[in-house]
């Protein structure tokens, strides 16, 4: 809306991506603050609460906490984006589809859990995976159709290692699946997934903006892809919406994001990494999500092979809970790890 107004009235201010990115952040933040109390009142009246696993006894007191808060910050993100973004940009539309598509998969899963009152209900693992693959396939297919380059880059190297061609499709689909489920596993404590998500969005947003900027990308010896910089506006809208969500999700949480939120965030983070040619760097940017996922993989593998557990419980944050760390201490320490690893990731951009 503002972008079109900029063209009609020849107002150069709204032509700058940085200005519209800042506005998107503020609009989304304020929208969540306005909408969330209304959603909370509705969720409490409908008993749309988070079912708690019987294996996490310390969380029994959270059984009355409403869930599906992700629906609110997705809504705020989309509204804010439509107000300030360039709607003629194909990468924006693919990003919106990715965000909403994975959010709808999570929404279907959340609804099943709420109606049954059992955290093990909802979508079956196979059904959930199938829907995620469909959304990922459409997103990657749209990228290929739009002519998006398929070269594979690694940190510290200024030229691509090779061109993936159509093999980019299965690789990117695996990325979508890995990141969405990693964020989902991390969302187990109040605000634990929210802040690392915000930090990761900021880092990837910076990378995508640089990738879309001819001068800065040339200076940093990074790949230049025309048009992707506009996605920064959508990225800051989601970051702002998550900041507003954190107002209610910080310890002690009044609302959980549910799979609606975690899957949408994970899908969008994977999309940003693809746009910024940062598929490998995402390991460092999303390090908190990576270590949570690895803890589950190692735990399951160790138990199947040796009949022994490595951790008291997986994902990793539950291990520290059982070691009697205070919940807010676990949360803040994970936030600190996310901040440090993202700082390291941004430093690597100049080392090529």
From Swiss-Prot:
Belongs to the glycosyltransferase 4 family. MraY subfamily. Catalyzes the initial step of the lipid cycle reactions in the biosynthesis of the cell wall peptidoglycan: transfers peptidoglycan precursor phospho-MurNAc-pentapeptide from UDP-MurNAc-pentapeptide onto the lipid carrier undecaprenyl phosphate, yielding undecaprenyl-pyrophosphoryl-MurNAc-pentapeptide, known as lipid I. PROSITE patterns: MRAY_1, MRAY_2. Its cofactor is Mg(2+). GO terms for biological process: cell division; cell wall organization; peptidoglycan biosynthetic process; regulation of cell shape. It is a multi-pass membrane protein. Its EC number is 2.7.8.13. CDD domains: GT_MraY. Pfam families: Glycos_transf_4. Keywords: Cell cycle, Cell division, Cell inner membrane, Cell membrane, Cell shape, Cell wall biogenesis/degradation, Magnesium, Membrane, Metal-binding, Peptidoglycan synthesis, Transferase, Transmembrane, Transmembrane helix. It comes from the Bacteria. The chain crosses the membrane at residues 24-44, 65-85, 87-107, 129-149, 159-179, 196-216, 227-247, 255-275, 280-300, 329-349. One of its GO terms (molecular function) is metal ion binding. It is an enzyme of class 2 (transferase). It catalyses: UDP-N-acetyl-alpha-D-muramoyl-L-alanyl-gamma-D-glutamyl-meso-2,6-diaminopimeloyl-D-alanyl-D-alanine + di-trans,octa-cis-undecaprenyl phosphate = di-trans,octa-cis-undecaprenyl diphospho-N-acetyl-alpha-D-muramoyl-L-alanyl-D-glutamyl-meso-2,6-diaminopimeloyl-D-alanyl-D-alanine + UMP. One of its GO terms (cellular component) is plasma membrane. InterPro entries: Glycosyl_transferase_4 (IPR000715), PNAcMuramoyl-5peptid_Trfase (IPR003524), PNAcMuramoyl-5peptid_Trfase_CS (IPR018480). HAMAP family: MraY. It is found in: Cell inner membrane. It comes from Sulfurovum sp. (strain NBC37-1). This is Phospho-N-acetylmuramoyl-pentapeptide-transferase.
